């Protein structure tokens, strides 16, 4: 299957989106971030948004990409949105939300449409979307996004916009993102219980890639790994093409739990140890340095402290980080070993701040590795922290309205039927990569 270049994929219509207000909500296991911004479409190194509001709350009731306590999660979401609204002096009624579940599937399709020496019209493109929806429909899953990747007519590729062209057969390559119906419906319900309508759902590893990858990295081949608290998500790019994305249900919180269990200490103390001494290069602490920590179940000043070698903490952290990154590598290899070939690895997210994680990732993937912060999106606020990569990418990615799925139905999503559905999408990727 031939996939088209990101350089031919589209973007927002400046005339349409200029000065529009957008809101995004990044729901994670550790934090919830709400951004409200105005799209200025002014291209410079400071970004093309005026960031109006930022809400940042500790997450509660959400773990490993799933809702585990709706009532407490609703309160966290409501507070993050309220904080962003207060800062912006605006009240929002719709929002873009992320999904970071290992139940999301990324499926490639090639659809052939006979055109019989007539002109390609919007009708043929709509037919292709309908075919993919029918092929990918199951009663327990929903399509939440379809990404067109490229076109060819009679075997000739490099067609940016096929509308108006003649030929015998039109081939369209698409990537369908699907997820278990209950997960999507639960996300919608919990957000809308805060009196905000879910306008769109975005897969987190794609958003993180938009926020962190350079054009050269997307072109030459890269694997983006977003190391969150409850999950680690990844997306693969080469030749400026989005190839694949997925999630493994392990993250930084698993390191904390491992430390707590192994050392018989509280989760709170384990988190402190992870932050202070949780590097993954064990030889950094081979000089026998120790740290004192209170044993689980004892109060302070009761003689319950015990000494723990820093190298022990690093060993525990390394074991879990290695397992998580290896799961990512194996998942990509199982799709296609070629996806790993000559790919640079880019790490982001809170877990990417672990000391030595870049060296460990280089060992596992046998590739160059860099740690990334999100590219500047606004000159008003500094969100250049890897924990904001997903939220920043969501803000940029959400500006493409040409393939927004407007309404979830029993067969997936009813697609926005714009006149330049595919060509607009291709321009967006060209503008943002």
Where are these regions (language model features)?
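Conserved phosphate-binding/catalytic loops in two-lobed NTP-binding clefts
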Residues: 122, 126, 364-392
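Hydrophobic alpha-helical bundle architecture
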Residues: 331-339, 343-350, 364, 370-379
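Nucleotide/phosphate-binding catalytic cleft detector across ATP-hydrolyzing
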Residues: 1-31, 35-223, 241-243, 266-268, ...
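Glycine-rich phosphate-binding loops at beta-strand->alpha-helix junctions
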Residues: 30, 179, 279-282, 340-364
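A short acidic Gly-Thr/Ser loop motif
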Residues: 25-31, 100, 224-231, 237-240, ...
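Extended, folded domain segments that form the structural surfaces/walls around functional sites
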Residues: 192, 226, 323, 330, ...
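Short beta-alpha connecting loops at secondary-structure transitions
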Residues: 243-244, 257, 309-312, 343, ...
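A conserved active-site cap/scaffold subdomain adjacent to cofactor or substrate pockets
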Residues: 249-273
């Amino acid at each position: 299957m031939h996939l088209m270049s990101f350089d031919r994929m589209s973007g927002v219509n400046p005339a349409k989106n200029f000065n529009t207000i957008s809101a995004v909500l990044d729901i994670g296991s550790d934090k919830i971030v709400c951004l409200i911004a105005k799209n200025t479409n002014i291209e410079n190194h400071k970004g093309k948004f005026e960031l109006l509001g930022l809400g940042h709350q500790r997450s509660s009731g959400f773990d490993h990409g799933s809702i585990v306590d709706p009532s407490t999660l609703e309160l966290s979401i409501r507070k993050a949105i309220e904080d962003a609204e207060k800062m912006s002096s605006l009240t929002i009624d719709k929002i873009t939300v992320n999904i970071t579940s290992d139940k999301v599937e990324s499926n490639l399709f090639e659809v052939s449409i006979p055109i019989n020496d007539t002109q390609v019209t919007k009708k043929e493109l709509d037919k292709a979307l309908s075919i993919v929806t029918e092929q990918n429909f199951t009663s327990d899953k929903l399509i939440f996004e379809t990404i067109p990747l490229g076109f060819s007519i009679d075997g000739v590729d490099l067609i940016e916009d096929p509308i108006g062209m003649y030929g015998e057969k039109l081939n369209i390559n698409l990537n369908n993102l699907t997820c278990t119906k209950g997960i999507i419906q639960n996300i919608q319900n919990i957000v809308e219980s805060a009196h905000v309508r879910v306008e769109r759902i975005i897969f987190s590893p794609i958003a993180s890639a938009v926020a962190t990858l350079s054009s050269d990295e997307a072109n030459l081949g890269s694997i983006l790994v977003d190391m969150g608290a409850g999950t680690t998500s990844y997306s693969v790019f080469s030749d400026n093409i989005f190839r694949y994305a997925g999630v493994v249900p392990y993250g930084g919180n698993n390191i904390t739990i491992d430390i707590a269990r192994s050392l018989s200490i509280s989760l709170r103390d384990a988190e402190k140890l992870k932050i202070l001494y949780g590097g993954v290069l064990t030889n950094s602490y081979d000089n026998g340095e120790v740290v004192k920590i209170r044993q689980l179940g004892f109060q302070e000043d009761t003689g319950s402290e015990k000494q723990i070698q820093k190298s022990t903490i690093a060993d525990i952290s390394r074991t879990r980080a290695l397992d998580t990154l290896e799961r990512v590598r194996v998942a990509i290899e199982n799709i296609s070993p070629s996806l790993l070939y000559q790919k640079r690895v880019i790490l982001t997210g809170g877990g990417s701040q672990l000391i030595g994680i870049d060296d460990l990732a280089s060992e596992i993937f046998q590739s160059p590795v860099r740690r990334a912060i999100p590219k500047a999106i606004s000159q008003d606020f500094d969100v250049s922290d890897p924990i904001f990569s997903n939220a920043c990418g969501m803000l940029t990615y959400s500006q493409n309205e040409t393939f927004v799925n407007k309404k979830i139905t029993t067969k997936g999503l009813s697609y926005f039927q714009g006149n330049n559905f595919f060509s607009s999408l291709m321009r967006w990727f060209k503008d943002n990569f």
